[in-house]
Amino acid sequence: MIDDHCHPFSLRVEPLDWDDLSLNIDPGDVASERRRADGPWRLAQELLTVRLASYLECDAAEVAVAREEASRDWSRYVTSLFADAGITDLVMDPSWPPGAAERLEEYAEMSGCSIYPMLRLDPMVDTAIEAGATARETLDYVLARMQTAAGSGYVAFKTILAYRTGLAVDPDASIGQAEESLRSEGPVRRRGKGLRDLLLRRALGVAADLGLPFQIHTGIGDSEIRLADANPLLLEELLRTPEAQAAQIVLIHGSYPWHEELAYLAATKPGVRADLSLFNLFSPVTSGERLLRILDLAPASKVLLATDGYHQPELFWFGAHVLRDSCEYASAVMREHGAREAWLGDVRSMIFEGNARSLYRL
């Protein structure tokens, strides 16, 4: 499997802590205690615990102890998890933690996978706004960084604009509007809508010229996001621009809960692809139904799979196994409706590996 979208995992052993398996990232001790209290009653955590117990050959109640023993050789343990999950390549966003982009060889060695980084644009915009840069200075800086990244091994670009000013992008935003938007009040991450809208359109044009895909966060996210701002249909006007039509765009996270909307965009926009990730970690039981709903409309040649794993290596492992279960479920339903076995085999190969290998030229 080529993991189409993920984040760095811990390079050193840390205690098993399912606090990571939560969409609530509110800071403080009270929020942390709430996550710990709710954790055992989240179905995803229950299923991850049971599955990990089977892998470690122990009772579910003994997972923490068995994992501590297994992880005494952390590198070997992490490598075994990725191998068991069948993950061979990682398309990674190394923007967090700080310094991760300089440690890609370590991630590759420990996981046993080839690592292909993508460049997230939003932190650069945030930093520029905070420093008082003009809109033109910010545009020039970010677009230049894209050019540099393309020449230094990066295979894609990414935006989490949904977390910032939302996906209701004005494709006609001007440099004047971009400058004016910098005078708005509020947190840095919510400022500069005109600038961020203008940048996205121009960045898509640069990505198209460079021949590199562009991932856009859609749908489900942690508690910082305003979910209504993450509907992929909000991108429709942007997707009609020449820059977007020339680009290869990957709408990530299955656009949860807007799966049909995502499938429609992938079916009707030649350059748009659908990535299924993240919800497999938090809504595992219905992930097969969600995959089926996308394959029911979108061409399988435009569907990619990812774990969106982060921090704890078990999340990559669990996410990949959920996706395999999901594919088996979707295949069974399609088979029941008459799909040929050879066709189903081709679809499985494409969505787990072939599509990503072709798109990112791996």
Locate each region found by the language model.
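Mid-to-C-terminal alpha-helical segments outside catalytic/metal-binding sites
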Residues: 1-4, 11, 16-55, 65-69, ...
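Hydrophobic faces of well-ordered beta-strands that scaffold small-molecule active sites
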Residues: 2-6, 89-92, 113-121, 157-159, ...
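Active-site beta-loop-alpha junctions enriched in small/polar residues
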Residues: 7, 95, 120-126, 160-164, ...
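Alpha-helical scaffold segments that flank or form the walls of functional sites
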Residues: 17-111, 117, 139-152
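Acidic (Asp/Glu)-rich catalytic clusters
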Residues: 80-84, 102-117, 145-153, 205-209, ...
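A gly/proline- and charged-residue-enriched helix-loop-helix capping module
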Residues: 119-140
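Divalent metal-binding pocket/active-site signature
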Residues: 152-260
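H/E-rich (His + Asp/Glu) clusters that bind or coordinate divalent metals
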Residues: 237, 245-248, 253-362
